[in-house]
Structure formats: structure tokens, C-alpha cells
Amino acid sequence: MAAKDVKFGNEARIKMLRGVNVLADAVKVTLGPKGRNVVLDKSFGAPSITKDGVSVAREIELEDKFENMGAQMVKEVASKANDAAGDGTTTATLLAQSIVNEGLKAVAAGMNPMDLKRGIDKAVISAVEELKNLSVTCSDSKAITQVGTISANADEKVGSLIAEAMEKVGNDGVITVEEGTGLQDELEVVKGMQFDRGYLSPYFINKSETGIVELENPYILMADKKISNIREMLPILESVAKSGKPLLIISEDLEGEALATLVVNSMRGIVKVAAVKAPGFGDCRKAMLQDISILTNGTVISEELAMELEKSTLEDLGQAKRVVISKDTTTIIGGVGEKHAIQARINQIRQEIQDASSDYDKEKLNERLAKLAGGVAVLKVGAATEVEMKEKKARVEDALHATRAAVEEGVVAGGGVALVRVAGKLSNLRGQNEDQNVGIRVALRAMEAPLRQIVSNSGEEPSAVTNNVKDGKGNYGYNAATDEYGDMIDFGILDPTKVTRSALQYAGSVAGLMITTECMVTDLPKEDKSSDLGSAPAGGMGGMGGMM
């Protein structure tokens, strides 16, 4: 076991504080409409430029192991805030830095660290309740545009694109961000349910100019099994042929004579048919087939339920207004499923999302939810260079997370004003003893830090502006972009309540742990023995050369 380097008390806390300040100072320059860029060196390729707090935080590793521990703990604050709300990482880092700095001063002055932490926790819990009281619901397109614009660093085009996407696919719809091919940002909306499976044979194509399969008002056969024997399909094929409608087959796989016979029938015009593999794998495939069956009002032919393909009838088949199949995707538009059944399925998936433990499961469930609820929108980000593209894509993703958070929990006045108002309302909050009161004051003082930093980044005097804002009421605040005072809601400067709440909670949690740290342990650096080892073989080789 490697020897350890151990530091205690004030010596440990000073080292940790240095690390906290290095990371936070690098991150906080990005805050606000006049925040600066940070250039990140890469091991290969061009450096990347960002104004995203968590991207800066993730790049920072310090040489001194004790300082690095402090930096990594604040990095955890940024990451947790990012995971919870998708934004607010810079605010969270700044709050943590302020609480740690003020808290460690109090510890050095002889205060009890545990009581300080209790005071901080009490202030944070009360502040979260006050934030909920200040929160206003965010449902109209204008408010969503404003939130997206602020989070994308005042890029109005991005804000309006996100609002348009949410309007078209609904608040639960899937919105993905991709790198575009041109200079302009674009929005592409896919209505209906789309999944990543294309046609099994190019001979199914009936639109040769576009290379796709289009089926109008088709029947849809869903089977949770491999189909290789055409005989078991003959009864249903004959029924479909008599109806004169096309047929889409979605199965685990379709191969051998079954596929060959379908291709021949399709080319001869006997039955207009197309076949695709079912989306997903294992249990996920079963669930997605069930989703499709509910959307199209059909039944999944499953051997697990002792159902046989040859006994299936037209009543077992789903229906839709239109199906479009490309080489890679299948889109079902206008499924005839009953609304109450679809809504019940949506509610069931929402419950599964709440119960899911892994991020992967949540992601897949969210995709399924969106496909049932509304559709899929793709935001294609345009830029002149690759460096700009990456920076802009990160901003658009942040803005998207922020708008989702705003729809979920509402919005509060932005520009650091909400936290200043909360701190003002809690000025009479008291703990059980004086040390807890100091902890409360530390947390309330930290709530001014985001506003102070926004003002500082815009080149103004933080104390003067902060006092002016504190003298005002309600949503009165400072617009750093235009250098004027007024109602932040009227200015369109909004922050999602969830983002502000998450930033405060995670900052308070980690900062409280750091204040109560009394000992730090790390590995001693290993001695470099390479120079001694390097000289021995050289001498040996020389001796061998002499022998030869």
C-alpha cells in the first residue's frame, strides 16, 4: 500500500480553498450577457472556445493533490446542477465558492463548523421554499423564447427555434440537437412515431425518385417473433389482398422464403407490402411493439401469449393514415389508436421514468414517451467553422435543458435578482445559537454572488448595483446587456426556478461538507527511478559488445 500524505485543520482547509478558488475563478468569468470566453487546449486538433461553465470545470485538474481535491469537489457541484437541470452550472459554482470562502473565515475565527453547516442548511431549505413562492408558470411561447434566449447567451434565434420546436412536438416531445451542414440554424420536425429501422429489402421501394416506401392507409401487422415460413402468413395476406389496402409488417426479423415471397407479391402488385424489423432489443423491443400497437389500435402477435400468426385476422392489425419508410427509419403518421388508451400508456411510461434508476433507462423511456406524445424535432445548428459549431451546439443544448426546466417548475426573475429577493425575505431567519446564525448569514451573503459577478463581468461596480437592486422590490433588477434598471420579467430576463433551486441546493450541500472538513489524505508522489534504471542496461550492453 502506498504511503499517504496527511494534512489537518487550517493547513488542509487553506489548500482546499486554493483549489476551489482556481476552478471557480475560471468558471465565473463566463457568467452573464457580457461574460467572457474561455479557451480550452485539446490534446489534438484546434483549441475549443466555450462560455459553458461545466465545460470549463471539467477541463480543470490541478498539480497539487490537496488543491485538486478542493477543485474536484466544486466540479461535483457544477456536474450535479447540470445533471439535475441542464444549466445553472456557473451559478452553482459561484454560490459554492462564496459559501466556502465565508464559511472557512468563520471556522478560522473559532466558530463551530457543524453549527455553521446547520445554519447554511437551514437557510438553503428556507430559500428553496421562498423560490417556489416567487415562481411563475412558464407555458406561453414568448416566455419559453425568453428563457431559451437567456440560456443561449442572448441568442434570440436559438430561443425562438426552441420555442417553435416545443410548440410543434409538445413539452414532452423529443428535441435533439445536431450539427447542421450550412451557416443557418434549422428546425426539422418529424410528426408521428419514428424509429430507427429501415426497409428489409430495397425491392419494397415504391417512390424511386426519393428511394422511400410510402404506404397510404395501411394495415400494420406486429409480431414479436422471427418469420421465415410464408405458410403461416398466407391467411392474413389473403385477407389484406381482398381489402385492397397495403400492409406493413413489423417483426423481430423476416427472412428466407417469407421475405422472397413478399418481395415477389409486392413487385407483381398482388399485395402492396413492406417489412421492417421491430425497434429495440429484448424487453425494450417488446415494450416498443406494445407502444406501436396502442398507437395503431392493433395487437402484437406474441408466442409468449400462445398466439399464432396463421390464426390472426384483420381485427388484430393496426392501422394508420400513412407510413413512410427510408433506408434507416420508419415513420408511422396518424395512428388510429384510441386517445384514452394512448394517454394511459403515456402515464404508465411517466411512472416508469420516475421509478427508473439508470440514466440509460430514463433516456430510452423519454424517447418512447415523446414518440407517443407528439413527435420528434431536430435542431440543426449552423456555423462557419468547426470550433464555432461545437461552442454553439453546447449553448443550444444548455438552452434546451433550461427551457424544459422552465416548463417543469416555472420561472423567476433572472440576472441574480430572485436570489437577492429571497435573501432579503430571510433576513430575520434565526438558528438555535449564534454559530448557526453566522451560517445563515454566510448563505444569505452568498446569494448575492451571482448578481455581483454579472455586474463585475459587465465592467460596472458590483456593490453600487447590488445596493440599488436591494433597494427595489419584486422583479426590479439590473439588465447588464443594456446597462439599465427595471422589471426583469418585462426585459425578458428569466431563469428557470428548477435551475436556480438546483444550483443553490447542490452548492449548499457540497460547501457544507467542505467547511466541516478537518483532515485531508492523499497518496505521496512516487519517486522517479527511471534515471537509475536507464543507466544499468546501457552499461550491460556495452559489456556484451566487448565480449563480441
Curated annotation (Swiss-Prot):
Which parts of this chain are annotated as the region Disordered?
526-548
The processes (GO biological process) annotated in the record are:
protein refolding
Q: What class of enzyme is it?
A: isomerase
Recite the UniProt keywords alphabetically.
ATP-binding, Chaperone, Cytoplasm, Isomerase, Nucleotide-binding
Any one Pfam family here would be: Cpn60_TCP1
Q: Which GO terms describe its molecular function?
A: ATP binding; ATP-dependent protein folding chaperone; isomerase activity; unfolded protein binding
Q: Does the keyword ATP-binding apply?
A: yes
Sequence positions that bind ATP? 30-33, 51, 87-91, 415, 479-481, 495
Q: What is its EC number?
A: 5.6.1.7
Q: Which reaction does it catalyse?
A: ATP + H2O + a folded polypeptide = ADP + phosphate + an unfolded polypeptide
A GO CC annotation given for this chain: cytoplasm
* Gly residues bias locations: 537-548
HAMAP family of this UniProt entry?
Answer: CH60
- Protein function: Together with its co-chaperonin GroES, plays an essential role in assisting protein folding. The GroEL-GroES system forms a nano-cage that allows encapsulation of the non-native substrate proteins and provides a physical environment optimized to promote and accelerate protein folding.
Concerning its family, UniProt says:
Belongs to the chaperonin (HSP60) family.
Subunit comment: Forms a cylinder of 14 subunits composed of two heptameric rings stacked back-to-back. Interacts with the co-chaperonin GroES.
Q: What protein name applies here?
A: Chaperonin GroEL
- Organism per entry: Buchnera aphidicola subsp. Pterocomma populeum
What does the record give as the organism's lineage?
A: Bacteria, Pseudomonadati, Pseudomonadota, Gammaproteobacteria, Enterobacterales
Protein encoded by which gene: groEL
